[in-house]
Amino acid sequence: MARILITSALPYINGVKHLGNLAGSMLPADVYARFQRLRGHDVLYVCATDEHGTPAELAADAAGMDVRAYCDEQHDIQKRSGEGFSLSYDYFGRTSNAPNIRLTQHFAQVLEEKGLIAERVEEQVFSIDDDRFLPDRYVEGTCPHCGFERARGDQCDNCGRLLEPTDLKEPYSKISGSKNLEVRETKHLHLVQTQMETKIRDWVDASTEWPSLAKSIAYKWLDEGLRDRSITRDLKWGVPVAQDGTPREGFEGKVFYVWFDAPIGYIGATVEWAEAGGGDWESWWRTDKGADDVTYVQFMGKDNVAFHTVSFPATILGSEEPWKTVDKLKAFNWLTWYGGKFSTSEKRGVFMDQALDILPGDYWRWYLTANAPEGSDAAFTWEHFQGLINSDLANVLGNFVNRITKYTVSKFDGTLPSAGTPGENEAWMAAELDQRLPALVANMEAMEFRKAAAEVRAIWAAGNEYLTKAEPWVKYKSDVDAAAVGVRTGLNLVALFGILAQPFIPEAASKILDALGVPDDRRSWEFDGPASALLDALPHGMAITPPAVLFAKIEDAQVAEWTERFGGAPEA
């Protein structure tokens, strides 16, 4: 039994996340976690809300709330949204909680002891009208690299380049809109990444289980040359700059930069899990305490890759303490919305709470996995969503389950028949499974989720083709035993389809397996023997209860309604 630690990029606290956030980190991490649990492995999947920094302060101000109260509210909302999509976190923590604060201050102290933290005076944008410094997203303006007119002071949303507020052209205050700005000196702590460049490059070179997207982004940063980066900000909300509980002299009004403390939040959330009775957190994170046998897998969108392959490793490796580093990193491209990006700040696209108002979570889980933005960006359109759901879930899966279970009730008194001997059609179905099940498992292990979903769809389609070949409803008229073979095989396929569906559409999978009375200990992904055994695994004579309709078709009128509500194109 392997031990697998899974983290997904922390969802930021400034509002409900959109479907692009879900598709690029939390959902694939959950699919993978469920798969590995079904394979019998010891899995710990942790996540947390990322709560510090300027966006939290700005969002709280806009809501007219205290920032702590705002974060409390938003954490609960995001937790409920995750539950609505059946995200199976072992723990969902918060970066504003005590464990992350302690760990962030610990890492800063250790890095300074190693000579990797330096106090420096730098120039920052100051708003005369607001009487304050404008770090990060408190200032916006024109990107000096691509000309995007709404670039933020920390990063351009259009080209993805990291920025400093002083880099922006025609800057203005996000608080007041004032352009009455000047550059003033302020003192901050810097992480001396230039001293870590060789060590980080060697570590990236040795990381063999990353997709090309992640590797290319890491090397791009390294090839451009690492810069020493400020890790503190002139803000009130964040991890205080302190050592052993004592504020650092001259830094009383400053906090650590959110991108310094946020990745440490993976560890902090695991500490929270342990404190809540989960277990020993150090055995998952400290290689001197048992984590040397852990496989650590990270999931994130491509905009987070540089921070996870360069900045966070600089913290971990620079400490020279025995911390577990990532083994496998799965990075995703964008899920696009009619040619543009989903955007939290622009309120563009469909958000998780809105999606759940429209349809249950399984509809979205399947679509976002089958359409995962892996090799390239993936486009969301209502028409594509409708077509995929109706074809895969309502027709190929739902119709199969409905047809064979109801026929069993109609012609075999609702019990699994035992008569008849398998023949050519059953051998064909077994051969399909012998070919496709190993491919499915291999794709899941490789975290190739589109390919995995395609294999599941192909297995469902093969089941439908089998019923067309077997024709139990035709054979019943002249050879009940031959019909019984088709029904028995079909019902075993229903059970197998439910087992295979668990990582992707867990609620529907449970309905299928519960209807067949499949016990929990028979729901694992164990396909080591010949597939023919899977086609006769259910007890003969068992009672069959057809499940309720699993997936309703999406009608054209619904697509028209949703297009009207959410739009079919990004804002200009």
UniProtKB/Swiss-Prot annotation:
Location in the cell: Cytoplasm
Name assigned to this protein: Methionine--tRNA ligase
Protein residues bound to Zn(2+): C143, C146, C156, C159
GO molecular function: ATP binding; metal ion binding; methionine-tRNA ligase activity
Metal-binding found in the keyword field: yes
InterPro entries: Anticodon_Met, Met-tRNA_ligase_1, Met-tRNA_synth, Methionyl/Leucyl_tRNA_Synth, MetRS_core, MetRS_Zn, Rossmann-like_a/b/a_fold, tRNAsynth_Ia_anticodon-bd
Broad class of where this protein is predominantly found: cytoplasm
BP terms from Gene Ontology: methionyl-tRNA aminoacylation
Note on cofactor: Binds 1 zinc ion per subunit.
Pfam families (UniProt xref): Anticodon_3 (PF19303), tRNA-synt_1g (PF09334)
Keywords assigned by UniProt, alphabetized: Aminoacyl-tRNA synthetase, ATP-binding, Cytoplasm, Ligase, Metal-binding, Nucleotide-binding, Protein biosynthesis, Zinc
Record-listed ATP binding positions: T344
Gene, per the UniProt record: metG
GO cellular component entries: aminoacyl-tRNA synthetase multienzyme complex; cytosol
Entry EC number(s): 6.1.1.10
Task of the protein: Is required not only for elongation of protein synthesis but also for the initiation of all mRNA translation through initiator tRNA(fMet) aminoacylation.
Homology family: Belongs to the class-I aminoacyl-tRNA synthetase family. MetG type 1 subfamily.
